[in-house]
Amino acid sequence: MLEEKLLKKIKTINENFINLGFDLEEDFIELVTQREDIRDRIENTKYKKMTFSKDEEANSYILNLEDCQISFDIIEGEDEEGPWFEVECNIIFF
């Protein structure tokens, strides 16, 4: 279970992604649950130092921290059941 303070920060971060066009809260929670190093970076990076962007061409939503970039790549399609999407997360450390 994630701490309330971290969940609040994730909700605030997700508001930026929603403003860019996509709700990534569940995917973000899954990421910080699976990757302790990313959770620590999120907890220890001040919100003001985070930047957010969208790569329209790649359909990616990007969070830049001080020493890494997290991109959520959205793959969309349609089948006999209707439209679907998948989210793939990529992390680049600098």
Name every feature range the model reports, one short phrase each.
Residues 1-38:
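N-terminal trafficking/processing presequences and adjacent post-cleavage segments
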Residues 25-93:
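Acidic, low-complexity, intrinsically disordered interaction modules
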